[in-house]
Every structure is written in C-alpha cells, then in structure tokens.
C-alpha cells in the first residue's frame, strides 16, 4: 500500500474518504488498487478520463511498465492519441467491432487520396464513414 501511495501521489489524501476525493484522485486510487494485486490481465475503462495532462502521462508510464513486465492490458478510451500507444486496437462502433489491428494497420486501411497519411483520429472517422456506407441498407 505504501509503495502504491508513493507511486501515485496518494499520501496527502490517505486520510480522506474516497467519496470526498476529486475525480483525478479517484482515478489514481483505482489504478493503484488494480496494480497492487499484480494481475496477469488488467482491464482499464477510460483510466485517464478526468485527470490532468501530467497525471495522464504518468498513468501511461505505469501502464507501459506493466506491459513490459508481461501484463496484458486492455484499455477503453475516447482519446485517439492514447489509442495510438497500444499494440493493437479494436474500433467499436454502435456496439460492433468494425476494425482491428495495429495503429499503423488502421491508418493504412483508412488512407485515401485526400488523406494519404491520416492521423489516428482521421483513421477512426474514415473507418466509421466506410462502415456506415457499407451498412446503409441494414
């Protein structure tokens, strides 16, 4: 507990009830708790939502550290720059997996004459537009 408190900057709020904490500290606490058990697989649902940019960066350093130790980490995010940190991405749209692959694979799938080298966000938007066109009669 003390190692995680230090790693996530939680010592200053150790005596506070969790319902009194700002969202950023709640997110830090949740990630620290999940890492204390040294899981083989870690599911993180929008772990950086509601945190400041510095804390967001720190979260990804912790996540990458876990991956380097052999932990499988699955992350849901609406931040496309965060999706690009991942080895593999699954694009879920309207409850369906419509594309999956490495960030480079998804960008290549969505490249066109107008956007020969799309950003991750442009790729996601293009893949969704393509899916909508293919499934417009459903």
List the predicted regions and their residue ranges.
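Catalytic Walker B motif of ABC-type/P-loop ATPase nucleotide-binding domains
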Residues: 42-45
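Hydrophobic anchor residue at the start of the ABC signature
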Residues: 31, 59
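Conserved catalytic motifs of ABC-family nucleotide-binding domains
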Residues: 38
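ABC ATPase "signature
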Residues: 100-101
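Conserved ABC ATPase "signature" region
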Residues: 1-13
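Conserved ABC ATPase signature
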Residues: 17-21
